[in-house]
Swiss-Prot record:
Binds 1 [4Fe-4S] cluster per subunit. SUPFAM superfamilies: Thiamin diphosphate-binding fold (THDP-binding). It is an enzyme of class 1 (oxidoreductase). The gene is porB. This is Pyruvate synthase subunit PorB. Keywords: 4Fe-4S, Iron, Iron-sulfur, Metal-binding, Oxidoreductase. It catalyses: 2 oxidized [2Fe-2S]-[ferredoxin] + pyruvate + CoA = 2 reduced [2Fe-2S]-[ferredoxin] + acetyl-CoA + CO2 + H(+). Heterotetramer of one alpha, one beta, one delta and one gamma chain. Its EC number is 1.2.7.1. One of its GO terms (molecular function) is thiamine pyrophosphate binding. It comes from the Archaea. [4Fe-4S] cluster binds at C21, C24, C59, C222. Its cofactor is [4Fe-4S] cluster.
């Protein structure tokens, strides 16, 4: 009888028993990422354990390493909110000096990456360190009290962007750090989502195998900060892809003229010219994604705000070289 090989290694580097919230999408992301990293190290260096982690303060640090306990089954160091990339750079330099084969994984949330740690990240990428930076993006400072970050989407409620008579909630467009990383002309940049775990695993493995720096921005649901049902995390993340809210793409060697766009699914029609995706007609409206989330519920009383969000998404896709057709619910 044939035995089917598991789609990913059964080795575990993120142990159960950590303190993450029930339904935490970021915990899922880190478990998958470390598995994928292990596979890449085994394929490249013959050693599945040939990696170490430098992790910034944030949700996943706090829930995984409350002294004297840890959920990590790999060499791991907790560093400050702003310097995961800098610490990873130092570890990588030490490994190079000592002749240690392997790769360093730096991990930070959207606050520690898009805001506080952006300078350190830029320096790491520009210097060409052999490090993969994984940004888990749950779109706010969830660990410290659900405060807005520059990665918070337009219109979202947070404790520092509360909607009201004179406020729509978050009033700035989302910052796409992946595009900033690509501007450094590094070997590999990608966006991913727990809503498409196989794509995520493939991209982490690809990032881990390149020589030089790589950056992966993964979209993670947060039931606590997003006010969503615990059991719908993967479904909601998938809806972000299928409605156009979260694009899946790859940029290699800073070549923004040849961005590789992954099809969103959900019945969307994808049109190509010369092998490049140039137009996507989405079937599902963004309201399908918004309706499950308490952080967006006030927008349904302000349809003009949803239209503004829709326009911002179209503008983001235009930057990627794609004309996005986003339907309204009645269409």
């Amino acid at each position: 009888m044939a035995v089917r090989k598991p789609p990913i290694t059964t080795r575990e580097y993120w142990a159960p028993g950590h303190a993450a919230c029930a339904g935490c999408g970021c915990a899922t992301a880190l478990r998958l990422a470390t598995k994928a990293f292990s596979e890449a190290m085994e394929e490249k260096y013959g050693d599945p354990n040939a990696f170490a982690i430098a992790q910034a303060t944030g949700c996943m640090e706090v829930v995984s390493a409350v002294f004297p306990y840890t959920a990590w089954k790999v060499p791991w160091v907790h560093v400050a909110f702003e310097n995961a990339a800098a610490a990873a750079s130092g570890i990588e330099a030490a490994w190079k000096k000592k002749g240690i084969k392997g790769k360093i994984l730096a991990i930070g949330g959207d606050g520690g990456t898009a805001d506080i740690g952006l300078q350190a990240l830029s320096g790491m990428l520009e210097r060409g360190h052999n490090v993969v930076y994984l940004m888990y993006d749950n779109e706010a400072y969830m660990n410290t009290g659900i405060q807005r970050s520059s990665s918070t989407p337009y219109g979202a409620w947070t404790t520092t962007s509360p909607p009201g008579k004179y406020s729509i909630g978050e009033d700035r467009p989302k910052k796409w750090v992946a595009l900033i990383a690509a501007a450094h002309m590094i070997p590999y940049v990608a966006t991913a989502s727990i809503g498409n775990p196989f794509d995520f695993v493939k991209k982490v493995k690809k990032a881990a195998k390149v020589d030089g720096p790589a950056f992966v921005q993964v979209h993670c649901t947060c039931p606590t900060g997003w006010r969503t049902p615990l059991e719908k995390g993967i479904e909601i993340a998938r809806l972000a892809i299928e409605t156009g809210m979260w694009p899946l793409f790859e940029i290699e060697n800073g070549d923004i003229w040849h961005i590789k766009i992954q099809p969103p699914g959900g019945g969307a029609k994808v049109y190509k010219e010369g092998g490049r995706v140039v137009r996507i007609e989405f079937k599902k409206p963004i309201e399908e994604y918004l309706k499950y989330q308490g952080r967006f519920k006030h927008l349904f009383k302000r349809p003009e705000a949803i239209d503004e969000l829709r326009n911002q998404i179209k503008a983001m896709w235009k930057v990627l070289g794609v004309e996005a057709i986003l339907p309204k619910p009645e269409e």
